[in-house]
């Protein structure tokens, strides 16, 4: 990347109109850029008001939006792929996971969570929660199973102690899953008094490890932002 290249990321603003708001896709790309270590400008956009800041180059587009030397990119997955391809070694770290399974671990959790938390029929709550719990348990099993490189170092290792999906390094897989997993834990704990269970110790360790990672902690919206976003969709119990 040329030294004069300009990178600008537009993300959803919080209720105060300035800090980072509730938008897992925005947090995902924000983390990618921080992990790459590339200079960029972050612009928070108040979506409740006229999007004057976007009208000249991305009218009608959904956030997040990347502006790369004047070139507009609006699809989150395509932006992520573009950044990984453009900002690669030796100048920037690769964030691609080593293991293909890391890319899909936990990918059904958010769908199960949405069905549970937005369910209008109380008698269906338990069945929907059990589906969410099974999805979380599958993630726990993946995080518990030693990866090949761990077994190469410790052939008799029975349980992984890694911090993240693919090892001890944050990857694109974590950038995708963790913002959503944090929402699941925050929203279920507040509205249903059902945080991710302590028995799923590897998932809890995973979340705790994320909160110790400055790139995740710094990009997280306040819990109040997340709860306010879900308040209209959650039926009281």
Swiss-Prot record:
It catalyses: chloride(in) = chloride(out). Residues 1-89 are annotated as: Required for insertion into the membrane. It is an enzyme of class 1 (oxidoreductase). A motif (G-site) lies at residues 23-26. The chain crosses the membrane at residues 25-45. One of its GO terms (molecular function) is chloride channel activity. Gene3D superfamilies: 1.20.1050.10, Glutaredoxin. Its main location: nucleus. It is a single-pass membrane protein. One of its GO terms (cellular component) is extracellular region. It is found in: Nucleus; Membrane; Cell membrane; Cytoplasm. Its EC number is 1.8.-.-. Keywords: Cell membrane, Chloride, Chloride channel, Cytoplasm, Disulfide bond, Extracellular matrix, Ion channel, Ion transport, Membrane, Nucleus, Oxidoreductase, Phosphoprotein, Secreted, Transmembrane, Transmembrane helix, Transport, Voltage-gated channel. The modification Phosphoserine is found at residue 160. One of its GO terms (biological process) is chloride transport. Residues 69-236 form the GST C-terminal domain. Disulfide bonds join 23-26. Residues 13-91 form the GST N-terminal domain. The active G-site contains a dithiol Cys-X-X-Cys motif which mediates glutathione-dependent redox catalysis. Members of this family may change from a globular, soluble state to a state where the N-terminal domain is inserted into the membrane and functions as a chloride channel. The redox status of the active cysteine in Cys-X-X-Cys motif likely determines the capacity to adopt a soluble or membrane-inserted state. A conformation change of the N-terminal domain is thought to expose hydrophobic surfaces that trigger membrane insertion. Associated with the C-terminal of MAPK15. PANTHER family: CHLORIDE INTRACELLULAR CHANNEL 3, CHLORIDE INTRACELLULAR CHANNEL PROTEIN 6-RELATED. Belongs to the chloride channel CLIC family. In the soluble state, catalyzes glutaredoxin-like thiol disulfide exchange reactions with reduced glutathione as electron donor. Reduced in a glutathione-dependent way and secreted into the extracellular matrix where it activates TGM2 and promotes blood vessel growth during tissue remodeling as occurs in tumorigenesis. Can reduce specific cysteines in TGM2 and regulate cofactor binding. Can insert into membranes and form outwardly rectifying chloride ion channels. May participate in cellular growth control. This is Chloride intracellular channel protein 3. It comes from Mus musculus (Mouse).
């Amino acid at each position: 990347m040329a030294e004069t290249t300009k990178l600008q990321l537009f993300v959803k603003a919080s209720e105060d109109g300035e800090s980072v708001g509730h938008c897992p896709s925005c947090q995902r790309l924000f983390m990618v850029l921080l992990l790459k270590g590339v200079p960029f400008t972050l612009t928070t956009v108040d979506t409740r008001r006229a999007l004057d800041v976007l009208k000249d180059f991305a009218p009608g587009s959904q956030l997040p939006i990347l502006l790369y030397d004047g070139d507009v990119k609006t699809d989150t997955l395509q932006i992520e792929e573009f950044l990984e391809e453009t900002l690669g070694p030796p100048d920037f770290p690769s964030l691609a996971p080593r293991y293909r399974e890391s890319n899909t671990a936990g990918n059904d959790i958010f769908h199960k969570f949405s069905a549970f938390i937005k369910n209008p029929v109380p008698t269906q709550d338990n069945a929907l929660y059990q589906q969410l719990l099974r999805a979380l348990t599958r993630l726990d099993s993946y995080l518990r199973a030693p990866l090949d490189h761990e077994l190469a170092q410790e052939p008799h290792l029975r349980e992984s102690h890694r911090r993240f999906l693919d090892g001890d390094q944050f990857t694109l897989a974590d950038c995708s899953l963790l913002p959503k997993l944090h929402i699941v834990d925050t929203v279920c704990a507040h509205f249903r008094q059902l945080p991710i269970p302590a028995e799923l110790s590897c998932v809890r360790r995973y979340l705790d490890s994320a909160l110790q990672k400055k790139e995740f902690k710094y990009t997280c919206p306040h819990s109040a932002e997340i709860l306010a976003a879900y308040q209209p969709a959650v039926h009281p119990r």
